[in-house]
Design a protein with these regions (language model features):
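Short, hydrophobic beta-strand segments that form beta-sheet elements in well-ordered domains
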Residues: 119-125
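Accessory nucleic acid-recognition modules appended to NTPase machines
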Residues: 1-88
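Domain-level recognition of nuclease-like catalytic cores that cleave nucleotide substrates
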Residues: 126-147
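Active-site ExK catalytic segment of metal-dependent nucleases
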Residues: 89-98
Length: 147
């Protein structure tokens, strides 16, 4: 099920690799390599979050679909969860401990496009505790995936 506002705003295909360990092995990623060149860490972290959300979605109790969102201006949201009833949650993944208002740009655009169906936008980061960034927007630590 795809919400009309998502289609109209520009849902774009993105390949999500189902196993971040396998992806890391294929890319030759190691702690040493990532420490020297962090450019591969962001995509690995996004894949890890996608895998965790996919696992948890299997026991959610309501059907849901996972998407990547990109609009005509190339603003994006790493992961959009849409329930069978049309509720939407956007997740942006940041490989950083610091978050600023600009990190919510794609989530704000998704919220505007989807109106009341948009329930929450989260920037997952390496921070310590949740911090509100406006109406239905919050920065939260990665550990919230298991809370």
């Amino acid at each position: 099920m795809v919400s009309e506002p998502i289609e109209a705003a520009g849902k774009d295909a993105q390949v999500a690799f189902p196993g971040f360990r396998l992806l890391g092995a294929l890319l030759g990623a190691s702690a040493e390599r990532i420490a020297k060149d962090r450019s591969s860490f962001g995509p690995l972290l996004e894949t890890f979050v996608f895998s965790e959300v996919l696992k948890q979605a299997s026991w959610f109790g309501e059907s849901c679909a996972l998407y990547h969102y990109r609009d005509k201006d190339q603003d994006e949201v790493d992961l959009v969860i849409e329930t069978g009833s049309g509720a939407l949650v956007g997740i942006e993944v940041k490989a950083s401990a610091t978050v600023n208002a600009g990190d919510f740009k794609g989530l704000r655009k998704l919220a505007d496009a989807c109106g009341d169906n948009f329930k929450l936008g989260v920037v997952l980061c390496d921070g310590g505790r949740p911090v509100p960034f406006g109406d239905r927007l919050v920065a939260a630590p990665m550990s919230c995936l298991w809370a």
